[in-house]
Amino acid sequence: MGGSESTGRKVSFGMDEEERVRVLRGVRLSDEVVNRMKDSNLPSKDQSTSTASGTTSGPTTFPSKAGPSASHSASTSKDGAHKPTARGVGHQYAEEDLYRRYEKEQALIQEELARLAKREREAAHERLSSSVLREKNITSQERRKAEHLPADLDEWAKELEQKEAELQRLNTFYREQLNSIEKKNLEIYKLTAEQFHTAASNAELRVKQRSYDPVCMDLQSNILKCYAENKQERLNCSDLAKEYGKCVSAAQKNLLFNHG
């Protein structure tokens, strides 16, 4: 719609009493309008011919828009005070031609400004339509979210209840397992303590039951007596010493056999 061409262009214009656009600032004419204005500045063949005929045929009547010099020439010609010359007629025609070109340029500018204003209106309409459509989409999305919100809340509540039930079940299970482990540890401790006390009691009984009575007391007394009597000839007591050694060995074997 022409919105892309007018993006970034700021045009300020106003309307006069005849509903014509007057440029204030910020107007950039297109190349087409500039070319048309250049073409309008070049004099046409008809204008050259009419200029030549005007210089040879005498006074000519022109429109009232020719300006003050044309009105003055017409009045002086009517009164008969001064007759128009070729130079005066050429000057008058040049002013009229300049005015006509001015009018044509103004028409081109009016056309260009009208086209720019139309583009600006279309671009503004496009932007407004896009904004309205975007707001409608956002409103529609928010409405759909609001419609689905209660259902989502119910679903979330159910999920939370299920998670709480699962956590409660796991808590109960782990508590039961902990109690079972504590009971087993207590039973093992009691059994170990009982076994320890039993083993200690048995060891104490075994130690108390053992008696270490002197062995071979008669032979020991005889050897001591023999040594005392035969201080210089102790070899005489060798037989008693051998018998004492045999007696001690036999007593050791008997002790190991009974308590082994």
UniProtKB/Swiss-Prot annotation:
Protein name: MICOS complex subunit mic25-a
Placement of sequence motif Cx9C motif 1: 216-226
PANTHER family, alphabetized: MICOS COMPLEX SUBUNIT MIC25 (PTHR47609:SF1)
Positions of the UniProt region annotated as Disordered: 1-92
Assembly notes: Component of the mitochondrial contact site and cristae organizing system (MICOS) complex (also known as MINOS or MitOS complex).
N-myristoyl glycine lipid modification positions: G2
Residue ranges of coiled coil: 94-187
Bias-annotated ranges (Basic and acidic residues): 28-39
Record localization: Mitochondrion inner membrane
Bias type Low complexity, positions: 48-64
InterPro entries named in the record: MIC19/MIC25 (IPR007964), MIC25 (IPR042860)
Source species of the chain: Xenopus laevis (African clawed frog)
Topological relation to the membrane, as annotated: Lipid-anchor
